[in-house]
Amino acid sequence: MMEVIDSVLGDRQSAIQLIDESKKFHQDALNYFNKCIDDRDVGLDYHVISVFGSQSSGKSTLLNHLFNTDFDTMDAQVKRQQTTKGIWLAHTRKVNTTHKLDGPASDLFVLDVEGSDGAERGEDQDFERKAALFAISVSEVLIVNMWEQQIGLYQGNNMALLKTVFEVNLSLFGKSHNGHKVLLLFVIRDHVGITPLSSLKESLIAELEKVWSELNKPVECEDSSLYDFFDLEFVGLGHKLLQAEQFQEGVKRLGDSFALKSANPYYFKPQYHHNLPLDGWIMYSENCWEQVENNRDLDLPTQQILVARFKTDEVAQEALSLFHSKYSGSVDHILDDREKLGEVLKNLKQECLIYYDERAYRYAEPVYLEKRSELAAKMEAEFRKTIGNFLDQLSESLMQRLQTEVLDKKNQHLPFQKRTKILVQSTKEEYWTAVSSFQQLELLRSTEEILQHFDEQVDTKIKQLKNDEVNTLIARANKSITLKVKEQAVHYLSNPERDTWDKILDMFEKTIQSSLSKYEISEGHYDFQVGFTEEENDSVYKKVCSRAWHVLNVTVHDYLKPDTIVSILRDRFETKFRYDEDDSPRLWRNEDEIDRAFRIAKDHALEVLNVLSFAATSDHVEIVPAFGEDNHEEDECYEDELGIQHSRHFAHILNELQKEKVLQQFRRQINLTVLDSKRSIIKTTTAIPIWMYLLVVALGWNEFVMVLRNPLLVTLVLLFGVGFIFVNKFGLWGPVLNVAHNAVAEVRITAKEKLRAIVMDEDEKRHLINSAGKESYEMKDMSDSDNEKIEKSE
């Protein structure tokens, strides 16, 4: 059962038995501490003091006089026996001092440890060792209470127990010594002054150093000294009964060192404190006792870290819950406003970190900072999502604007490379400004990945725009090249000569060069001003040329079909056959002249057949496209719908079979032309006999005279004769017949309408006559009835 001592002082809580004699830790210690501090923010401004010594040596009495506590004390007049059982804890802010303090002292928590070497426990030293270990683990100042006459003894002055304390201290702090110390305050009771305090001090120090030298130290602590882990102070107090005034005065002077920071010495030094907030110290002390009780290795720094981790994590979770409760509602409506978004996120982060700092900064600094960093990272992870959404919207907007401005006509006066460089720089600067603003507000820890991702987006967009620009450039160049190449190539092929292909090649190269002249930087080298490397520019040039060759290839092969070639040869033949050197029509006089002209014209026509069937220069070199128009991965020959084999090479226009067919058709057509010419000679040589003219004059003289005497008839005869000759010569009988047919049709339609009108007029007249008779009859009836009415009335 836990025992509780009722306090007789109104401003402090009763002492509690922190650890009972059954080695059980008080389960309601936290509630006791909360009552002691009364909701005040104590922070690290508290101190823990422990006392141990022999049983019935006046430990509790000393604490009650020094700190105004109410620990139970022994009544020596009744019986000397064990009074303090287990470890008791009391809280106080009142310390006995030589003069009145301006205000209450810091919160002091005093541990009264069960006395050692008691008859009640006998040889069972387990609890006293564990109690001493616990006291040194949790306290800043360890008061060693002893009598003057015990100095020089080994068991009597607790040197054996101190040896255990030293060994335990090395096991606790030796491996990871971080400057933490414990003050050993030796209070020598019943010091009557015969032996000077300095002499007693020297004796105790000598004994302590001897004990230290005999310790079994860990390897890493072999060279350590007593003073690396402990500070030593010595105080003498007079006899409580025989020297009551001196005792009280000594207690007050001792109180000055606990209450006054200006006192010399002042016992509460920073290196003594465990740097745990009060609620953390409670958890820490409970963990320490659990480790001690279970005989586990007690690593105090680790225990402090564990407590700090637990408490800081608890506070961090509270701060994070606060963050989540305010986050969504604060940012949803301002996602498109960078300044407001940054301000809201910054304020929310600061609010949560302040909440964490106020409650966690007192714990171990490395743990506090680590958890703070984790908390900030968790908030930044949420920020990253929100800021990421904002940056995605901004990125999309900037990409759209970049594309619009690159394609804007007002910027077209600048080369593509120059205008994209300017626009990309401004776009990146705007994005970088937005990202850096969030980073300056400490909302983004790292921006390298974000900026790298945006740069990749910009590069992708610029690459796309480059490709679009190049495709537009190629299309524009090919359009210009296509028009010129088709027109000029067809012209040259329609009027072939021996050097036709030389002219076509020269025209083709000049057309490409003129279309790309503004991009030419040197002979054969081009810069299309889109930021391409030399190899990429060369690739674009080759692509333009390749498409131009394709156009030429299609134009040539589509135009030079067998029928077209026959027509070209026939036109060439007829031009040479029908016209002389002055381009005047020939008048044939005899067949020999026709045969001679036929041979010349035929040879003239056939001399270009090879030109039209195979593309080669005048030096008989086959024309091969410079940029892969002939590089077919398929077979070099293919078969058309008629089963005729064709070559895929540019130069191969007609195969041998096609040439033979062209020759056959050509011969047939020119043979017909020759026959027509020879028929015209026969017609001109067949003349009308002279006697026939005389007979016509003799028999038709009267009619001839009649015509001459009638001018109108002469005029009509001349008009009709000229018209007849004109129509007959130009073959206009078809249009004349159409006009006559249309005129007759119009006359027929007009006649029908006139007849219809005449018939309609007759019908209308009859209808009017009938209508008039009926009306007169009705009027007569009405007049008769009126007369009858008049007669009746009379």
Swiss-Prot record:
Protein residues bound to GTP: 53-60
Chain ranges on the Lumenal side, renumbered to this chain: 709-711
Membrane-traversing stretches: 688-708, 712-732
Single annotated GO MF: GTPase activity
Residue ranges annotated for the GB1/RHD3-type G domain, each copy included: 43-272
Superkingdom of source: Eukaryota
Record-listed E.C. numbers: 3.6.5.-
Coiled coil: 331-352
Any GO BP: endoplasmic reticulum membrane fusion
CDD domains reported for this sequence: GBP
Protein name per its UniProtKB record: Protein SEY1
Gene of this entry: SEY1
